[in-house]
Amino acid sequence: MVASFSWRLLSPRFLGGFVLGAAASSASCVAALQLYDKREPELAPVAPEEKDPLEEYGFPLTGTEARQYINHALAYDPAKRTPKWVIEHLSRTKTVGSADRKHCKFKPDPNIPKMFSATNEDYLGSGWTRGHMAPAGDNKFSTEAMAETFYLSNIVPQNYENNAGFWNRMEMYCRDLTKRFEDVWVVSGPLELPTSHEDGKKRVTYEVIGADEVAVPSHLYKVILVREKGSEQPLAIGAFVVPNSPIGFDHQLPEYKVQLEDLEKMSGLLFFPQLDRDKGLKPLCDVDSCRLIQLHEFKLYIAARRVGGARNLQKLERILSELKEEGITPDGYLLDLYEKKRKEFSLKSGTDRDERKG
């Protein structure tokens, strides 16, 4: 029996099984040791991060972060209830269309907290008009975009003659630039500039209006950047500062030209910060006329707007009659509008007669 057992012990099958078993056992041990070595180390408890007492309840919010709308963006000054700056992009396609300001109303911006917003009542009886920084006329392509320009976050108290006159002519000039340039960017805003007093000191003082004490600016500014079709780099830039007071038609835009750096010092703003100013950027008035329309041209423009809004033939005829009394000859554009409107009234009158007969 011993011999039989010895034979079995020395048999290849037994030895092979032993070797395989031993190898498997050894492998299992090695694997176990490896798994043991790979165990996640026990982490020491992390002490809670100490908060700086300065930050415990947050820093004051200025409310001047940029707010974006369909075709303009702005930074709002909640203390003065006016914008600090308003930027817009103009192109030929945006300044034409069927959008009409008669469907728009001035109202508080729903994005501005009520406690920081101006209201229409602030302007009522104040002697100041509600002056657009991004004008409604730059958004003929979209009724919604035009309506957003009537938010009071885009409005400053403005002298009536300035708003309807020189500032309006500046806005018209910006729109006219889209006929000569592919892209036009305009940044507009209010300024409260210091004045010298008898004691030799300079002071910043400004009127406030209404229960919300909306700040009346002493000056207004525009920065105009233009780019030609097919170009990646803008061609020219111009900066202008005008007083918030009447300016007659005998004045032209170059009279109010300032260095961009000077305006940046006045406003505390850096305009177009991603613009490379070293790449051959030219002064706007060197590459374009900077010419604002003259009085007779302006009256033709106003007459054309009145023709479009005329509600009967009598009012339509009166518009042309008043122009002739002032010695102004209607241009082709105005006469075309007049004829189109007159035909509309004639057609409506004929339809009304037919309905009465029926």
Curated annotation (Swiss-Prot):
GO biological process: apoptotic DNA fragmentation
Cofactor requirement: a divalent metal cation
Pfam families for the chain: Endonuclease_NS, Exog_C
GO cellular component: mitochondrial inner membrane; nucleus
Binding-site residues, a divalent metal cation: 163
Keywords, ordered alphabetically: Endonuclease, Hydrolase, Membrane, Metal-binding, Mitochondrion, Mitochondrion inner membrane, Nuclease, Transit peptide
Main location, first listed in the record: mitochondrion
Origin: domain of life: Eukaryota
Active site: 132
Cited SUPFAM superfamilies: His-Me finger endonucleases
Compartment(s) of residence: Mitochondrion inner membrane
EC number: 3.1.30.-
GO MF, one example: metal ion binding
Family to which the UniProt record says this protein belongs: Belongs to the DNA/RNA non-specific endonuclease family.
Functional summary from the UniProt entry: Endo/exonuclease with nicking activity towards supercoiled DNA, a preference for single-stranded DNA and 5'-3' exonuclease activity.
Subunit and interaction comment: Homodimer.
Entries under PANTHER family matching the protein: ENDONUCLEASE RELATED, NUCLEASE EXOG, MITOCHONDRIAL
Miscellaneous note of the record: The active site contains 1 hydrated divalent metal cation that has only 1 direct interaction with the protein; all other interactions are via water molecules.
The name this protein goes by in its record: Nuclease EXOG, mitochondrial
Species in which this protein is naturally found: Xenopus laevis (African clawed frog)
